[in-house]
Amino acid sequence: MFFHAHPDDEALLTAGTMAMLAAEGHRVVLVTATAGERGLADMAPGEALGETRLKELYQSAAVLGCARVECLGYGDSGLSPKGGSAEERPDNAFMDADIEEAAKALAAILQEERADLLAIYDPAGGYGHPDHVQVHRVGRRAAEIAGTGIVLEATVNRDPLVRLLRLATRFYRFPPEFDVRTFESAYSPGEAITHRVNVRRYARRKRAAMSAHVSQASGGDSDRTLAVMLKVPGPLYRLVFGTEWYVRRDLPPGARLRHPFERWPE
């Protein structure tokens, strides 16, 4: 089972792994906490956007070979790094959800599916979105309740990312609100990563999953991250997006595993 905050998160971080496991014959289940109804798009935030993004989620899941898709029905906490003020957020914003209550809802699906593995986010929530941080908290607790044996935290090796961004600042002027230093505490350092999953064989499916999220390829005054990624040429795309990273906390930091179910020597 793969637990994400919003539709399109699955395509960015774990799509290759999901496609690989489905191709190997595993039953893959995708769960999102929200419908992403407060995301940035050319259409106004709200119920209509949420419905659109859920349709896109189902299209992405079909490409990846998912057997089941569920949404827990919490409200999208919005684009503000800290979710904005409580007055700006919906009453049922996921970042404000009772962790035990949300974890029980997720655990019920884990138990129903008899899931062997749950994929969530690292403690930083990747780049720090409050809904992503909540996915980590809720997912961890749900795995405890359900007795799920393997918990993988989807992440990115931030070491080469920070080096690349620092180099890019010499040649490219980023928007004023963009601060490379924020990535120094985002995602996970290379030494903490336990799984480096080669998903180059599934790059086309990963790209198709990204393409399914049409609403997230435009909106705002500048190029969206998803749109930029989809412009990367095929060979370079396989190189850049051909590895997916995970941290498994019950293994030694820096363990070098290449498959979610690979065993670490006792």
Residue map of PLM features:
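Metal-dependent de-N-acetylase/amidase catalytic core
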Residues: 1, 84-85, 92, 96-266
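Active-site rim/loop-helix segments in enzyme catalytic domains that contact anionic ligands
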Residues: 1-114, 141, 145, 247-250
